[in-house]
Amino acid sequence: MTLNNVTMRQGTVGMQPQQQRWSIPADGRHLMVQKEPHQYSHRNRHSATPEDHCRRSWSSDSTDSVISSESGNTYYRVVLIGEQGVGKSTLANIFAGVHDSMDSDCEVLGEDTYERTLMVDGESATIILLDMWENKGENEWLHDHCMQVGDAYLIVYSITDRASFEKASELRIQLRRARQTEDIPIILVGNKSDLVRCREVSVSEGRTCAVVFDCKFIETSAAVQHNVKELFEGIVRQVRLRRDSKEKNERRLAYQKRKESMPRKARRFWGKIVAKNNKNMAFKLKSKSCHDLSVL
């Protein structure tokens, strides 16, 4: 996944459904539901400083990709939700390059909305990451709208706080009710995985919750940037799997399988055979597959 541009946006326009604006003020009052973001107008950009040469790489091997983007960038609105203090803003800042020296042009226009163009499996995509769940003001109104505007959701909890895990389960139920007729990609994110001695929620509990609520699961550590790259690659793949044609997704899967080891292929093959006649084994396999963000 190769990162290109980053934008953090915060605006002041009124709520007009006709406008295709991604500006979001501090109180979230002007949050808009829109389906197709427009191309953003030209703005002055600030290039990275020379000392930013030690940038952490966020690329997934795509130099030999068999897939190319034929219609330009695709936009995905991804919403961060979860209890306060679980690390949502830290994940957003890492995504935006705040905690990572940048080797590309970037804009800093606000605190709530982050835009980044990246490459996943050889195709360009732009994630517009919304992190306004805890904004002061009309929280109930804002939460309702957050449930409506996302193309995908990251429900974040802290592995050191069981209450945040239980809240994440509640949010999954609320999201299902709000988007009953839609197949929305959701990833349950157990953050702060580096705090091993303070763990209150086990990995198996996270997996089970993901299986029960039909979503994906990953543990991350924003503090040491563990699995953060994989998280944002994964959410792009999850949206694509639901939106794009079967043929296109098969090409992507073939691209990914070329890099898969033979032992892993063998385990996956035999696992499917055993699962056909064993419900308990099928549940275990589904629990394991919830970690795989490249499949539905």
Curated annotation (Swiss-Prot):
Region of interest called Disordered, as start-end residue ranges on this chain: 1-20, 37-68
Keyword list (alphabetical) reads:
Calmodulin-binding, Cell membrane, GTP-binding, Membrane, Nucleotide-binding, Phosphoprotein
Bias kind Low complexity: ranges: 57-68
Q: Which GO terms describe its cellular component?
A: plasma membrane
Compartments where found: Cell membrane
Q: How does it sit in the membrane?
A: Peripheral membrane protein
Modifications made to the protein after synthesis: Phosphorylated on tyrosine residues.
Write down the InterPro entries for this protein, in alphabetical order.
Answer: P-loop_NTPase, RGK, RGK_GTP-binding_reg, Small_GTP-bd, Small_GTPase
SMART domains the UniProt entry points to: RAB, RAS, RHO
Membrane-spanning parts:
none
Q: Does this UniProt record's set of keywords contain Nucleotidyltransferase?
A: no
Q: Which GO terms describe its molecular function?
A: calcium channel regulator activity; calmodulin binding; GTP binding; GTPase activity
Q: Which residues bind GTP?
A: G82, E83, Q84, G85, V86, G87, K88, S89, N191, K192, S193, D194
Region Calmodulin-binding: what ranges?
Answer: 266-285
- Report the function annotation for this chain: Could be a regulatory protein, possibly participating in receptor-mediated signal transduction at the plasma membrane. Has guanine nucleotide-binding activity but undetectable intrinsic GTPase activity.
Q: What is this protein called?
A: GTP-binding protein GEM
Source species of the chain: Pongo abelii
